[in-house]
């Protein structure tokens, strides 16, 4: 009898434990469901915020594109100077067709500093790699949609443009301290691919120093001057160096052995002191070991006279 009572008491204890565990499970299930519902609400809210952000960014990009692209209809112009003198005074993207170009070319026209400038290169934030193969430099690459985008207009296009007559090259430079300098070269000309896009330029003026000619120091001119140099990329070495300048300096350029200017070098996000000169370099201003913050290279006919009518 005593054994039966003990068995009965144990059975009741086990049933109580089971009921208690069941209640705990139900409570835990309710708690987890509440947490899951909260997480679902948070995820939906984040998704809506992300969609709104992306939509806003897309709208801003479209607005920027619409604000900076100028549709001139069926009119064709050889460069931005002709566009300016036709009465189009706003900086932005246009299409041109140089005399020997087989197709239309999308360009950015800078209508400041007298107007009529065709921009051929821009560096601003490192968003584009300039360590590109020959074919990319030949046809051009980069962001030709946003007004501050980085790009190279293309060596073929440089040839088409500069074969139309005498052009001046203006280079605007800025460092990370907010200081700006400029260089202007007369008679800027780029040959065709058969001549490896050989570079020619004339007299210098400006406040940045003449890095392209290497004339700042006669002892280095033989290896630092870019006058008459052929264009080189990491996969097509046309420099005078026993190794490959473009490969070492991270960009295509008119290298000698190797350079005193390399505006297509590796973009460093801040001034730097380095053991190599592979940055965005203009020697006569900041030396070989300082990489510049921004660069704009642009050309305009030497005979350009703004039409003020």
Annotate each predicted stretch with a short phrase.
Residues 29-37, 116-120, 252-256, 265-269:
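Extracellular/mature segments of secreted proteins
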Residues 219-248:
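Extended, non-catalytic structural segments that build the interaction scaffolds
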Residues 2-115, 178, 306-309:
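Assembly "stalks" and propeptides
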Residues 70-226:
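Extracellular beta-rich globular recognition domains, centered on the fibrinogen C-terminal
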Residues 276-309:
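C-terminal helix/juxtamembrane-tail motif
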Residues 131, 240-287:
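Glycine-anchored, exposed beta-strand/edge motif detector
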């Amino acid at each position: 009898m005593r054994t039966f009572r003990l068995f009965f008491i144990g059975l009741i204890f086990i049933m109580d434990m089971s009921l208690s565990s069941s209640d705990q499970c139900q409570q835990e299930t309710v708690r987890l469901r509440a947490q899951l519902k909260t997480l679902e609400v948070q995820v939906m809210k984040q998704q809506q915020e992300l969609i709104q952000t992306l939509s806003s960014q897309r709208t801003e990009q479209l607005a920027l594109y619409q604000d900076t692209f100028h549709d001139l209809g069926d009119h064709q112009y050889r460069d931005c100077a002709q566009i300016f003198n036709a009465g189009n005074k706003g900086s932005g993207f246009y299409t041109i067709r140089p005399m020997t170009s087989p197709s239309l070319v999308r360009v950015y026209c800078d209508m400041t500093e007298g107007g009529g400038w065709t921009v051929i290169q821009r560096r601003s934030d490192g968003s584009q790699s300039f360590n590109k193969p020959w074919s990319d430099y030949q046809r051009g690459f980069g962001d030709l949609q946003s007004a501050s985008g980085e790009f190279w207009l293309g060596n073929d296009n440089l040839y088409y443009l500069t074969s139309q007559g005498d052009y001046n090259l203006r280079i605007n430079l800025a460092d990370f301290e907010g200081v700006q300098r400029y260089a202007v070269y007369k008679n800027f000309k780029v040959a065709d691919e058969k001549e490896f896009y050989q570079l020619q330029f004339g007299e210098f003026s400006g406040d940045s120093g003449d890095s392209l000619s290497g004339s700042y120091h006669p002892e280095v001119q033989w290896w630092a001057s870019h006058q008459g140099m052929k264009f080189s990329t990491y996969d097509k070495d046309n420099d005078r160096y026993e190794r490959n300048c473009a490969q070492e300096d991270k960009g295509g350029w008119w290298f000698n052995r190797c350079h005193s200017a390399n505006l297509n070098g590796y973009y460093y996000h801040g001034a730097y002191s380095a053991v190599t000169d592979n940055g965005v370099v203009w020697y006569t201003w900041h030396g070989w070991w300082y990489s510049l913050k921004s660069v704009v290279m642009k050309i305009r006919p030497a005979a350009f006279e703004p039409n003020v009518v």
